[in-house]
Design a protein with these regions (language model features):
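N-terminal secretory-pathway/extracellular module detecting exported/lumenal segments
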Residues: 27-177
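Cleavable N-terminal signal peptides
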Residues: 15-16, 26-27
């Protein structure tokens, strides 16, 4: 650069300074900031109508229980927050029913309850309901919903209520034919 005139030196300097703004390092910093994952935010949840017997879809939990497990097909939804929401009905051998409106996050393996059904066919909202990990034991119905119907690892996620109903009625593998 020592053989260039002063004005040419300034032009070359400006060129290289300008070029540095487009360097991979400068670009990658902006790129990372633009595409940072935003923190997950749950959408506002509306309670569904109380389940009707004709809308209940049975699902298998295994031979270790004498309870019957159902999902209300009309309550199924998949939110923009990627939560599958549903009403679960569990009927014990003596006929007692437990009804709950719940959500499941396939990406984190968590679930939460939003409300429980009362005998007068109304909902009782859960106060301070928190997301918790899906584990076996007394929650076997949730484990089966997660692994066998809604969130099977390695397969496409349930994207719509129709996908979820099809998985419950015909098995997980029938969902994506």
């Amino acid at each position: 650069m020592f053989f260039l005139k002063k004005q040419e030196k300034i032009q070359v300097l400006v060129f290289f300074v300008g070029l540095s703004f487009f360097s991979p390092v400068a670009f990658s910093a902006d790129f990372d900031n633009e595409f940072e994952e935003k923190p997950w935010k749950e959408i506002e949840v509306q309670l569904p109508p109380f389940p009707e017997r004709e809308n209940l879809i049975p699902f298998e939990v295994g031979s270790v229980t004498d309870k019957q497990f159902f999902i209300d097909g009309d309550s199924l939804s998949v939110g923009s927050d990627e939560v599958i929401r549903y009403t679960m009905v569990v009927i014990g051998s003596g006929g007692a029913q437990n009804i709950s409106f719940e959500g499941m996050r396939c990406t984190t393996g968590e679930r939460r309850s939003y409300a429980f059904g009362r005998s007068d066919k109304t909902w009782s909202r859960v106060r301070n309901g928190q997301w918790g990990k899906i584990r076996g034991g007394s929650n076997q119905g949730h484990v089966n919903l997660f692994s066998d119907y809604f969130c099977n690892v390695g397969e496409r996620a349930i994207l719509s209520p129709e996908d979820a109903r099809r998985a419950l009625r015909y098995g997980r593998s029938a969902t994506f034919r």
